[in-house]
Amino acid sequence: MLALISPAKTLDYESTLPTDKHTLPRLLDQSQALIDYCRSLSASEIASLMSVSEKIAKLNAERFQDWTSELTLANARQAIFAFKGDVYTGLDAYHLQENDFEFAQKHLRMLSGLYGLLRPLDLMMPYRLEMGTKLHNSRGHNLYEFWDDRITRLINEDLEQTNSKILVNIASDEYYKSVKEQKINAQIVKPVFLDQKNGKYKVISFYAKKARGLMARFIIENKLENAEDLKAFNSEGYYFDLENSNQHELVFKRDEQA
């Protein structure tokens, strides 16, 4: 089993790292090409392109200039600890055990606008470059065209190396769109998380993001290999909804708290 999650805009480069074990991203030459494009942008152009404030644009212009492919623990940190959004609150990587990291390194992947596909212990410098960014480049007008099938090929390599027959899509639509689904050499399963509100079950973004992280943690802690085992997921009140699920989409519901 190989699980895909999205990165986060919020980053943490302050907390004490629980391990110094690390690896390097495998598509750094592609990252360098993207950085070269980004370095040509002014802060105001970045603000317009990314729809961010001038302050955030200036910070990221500086990050693009400072970026290097010579990654070390002195200038970077492992992706699983660097990301800090709702998904990573659910994942809670800082409280995983040593053997969990070994499993995660083989069975969890983070999609990334800048790095393409990250393993948990791959080092990364702070950046902001969302997959949906319409960054003009030599391969097209956006990052989907830039990455083309490179991310997909690497996913297939990982599936083969881990003898995985299942790809679990717990990434956002924006990031999963970078995967050429028809070229994936595995059964694809997508967990969907519905929360009850005013008597109706629906996807509530904040809860769904955290639930994706909880599912990633569930897979890692239980060393899951089969899609059937995902149905046992019951973190924080979620339960499997057999009636509304099928072999491609597993629905999990959580009832409204009184």
Curated annotation (Swiss-Prot):
Top-level lineage group: Bacteria
GO cellular component term of the entry, any: cytosol
GO terms under biological process: response to hydroperoxide
Similarity comment text for this entry: Belongs to the UPF0246 family.
PANTHER family: PEROXIDE STRESS RESISTANCE PROTEIN YAAA, PEROXIDE STRESS RESPONSE PROTEIN YAAA
NCBIfam families: PRK02101.1-1, PRK02101.1-3
Protein name per the record: UPF0246 protein ACIAD2218
